[in-house]
Amino acid sequence: MKLVTFEKDGRSAVGLLNAAGTAVHPVPGCTDMQALIGIWPVLDTAAVLRGEALPLERVRLLAPIPSPAQDVICLGINYFDHAKESESVAGKGVKAPDTFPIYFSKRVDEAVAPGGDILSHNDLVADLDYEAELAVIIGKAAYNVAEADALDYVFGYTILNDVSARTIQNQHKQWYRGKSLDGFTPMGPWIVTPEEFDVRKSRKIQSRINGELRQDSTTDRMIFHVPYVIAELSQGMTLRPGTIISMGTPAGVGMGFDPPKWLHPGDVVACSIEGIGTLTNTVR
């Protein structure tokens, strides 16, 4: 099932997308995804799907979680091909993790909606980059969970573009600031629930810039997979419902080309994951 956050007549709401992908069924009394996560175990989805239906073209999709309660937890260098690519970039290489994942956080003032603008910050940034990523949404509090049970704590999956300012990212050694400027977190177009998206299956993950294929990989090329990451993060640290974990990006980012292929105002960035859909945004 696909779950959306949308705006109609100036008001935001959440709903279920019908099977054809043509209409949204609002969830009565539920104005944001965090609330939907809370009632999801008891929600009568069949009743919602029998209720009011809004044509998809008459609503404006928002990021599924427009204002995350916490910073996004991100993984760095978590695809084998991206690890090789990163090591080849002179002066900027980071060796692939072989024992433990690389974690960092990404501040999100407001996630960018599907069709929304990526801010170029031309006054600060000369090397704007894109990163198509699978994002995991936690559905119930996870603490000291076993890897075998980790997927029981997942609410759903979406696409996140981990937009990055490379010079700032590397100037500060820690990646936080270079990943966290306003307009650097496109997310969407919706959340897909686990019964529709089995994360254990390999899925195509791609990005295109102005129609040109840049990233083209599969999720089985991850170094550390979703169950392991949830289990490890939960050891001694509670993952609350609504926590977002972004699983890293494959090769084909702009910095990996010679010369680099940075983003510029007017560029259209499309990130796709098989089984979820496509998240499209324009650089402004």
Question: What role is predicted for each listed range?
Answer:
Residues 1-97, 101, 268-270:
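N-terminal non-catalytic cap/leader segment that marks the start of a structured domain
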Residues 91-112, 130, 264-275:
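Structural signature of FAD isoalloxazine-binding scaffolds in flavoprotein oxidoreductases
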Residues 112-150, 155, 160-164:
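Non-heme Fe(II) oxygenase catalytic core, chiefly the N-lobe of the double-stranded beta-helix
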Residues 93-106, 149-177, 181-182, 222-225:
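Flexible glycine-rich active-site/ligand-binding loops centered on an Asp-His dyad
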Residues 9, 49, 60, 82, ...:
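Catalytic-pocket segment enriched in acidic/His residues
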Residues 63-65, 71, 96, 126-128, ...:
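Residue "hotspots" at secondary-structure boundaries inside conserved domains
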Residues 4, 62-64, 91-94, 119-128, ...:
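A generic local secondary-structure boundary/capping motif
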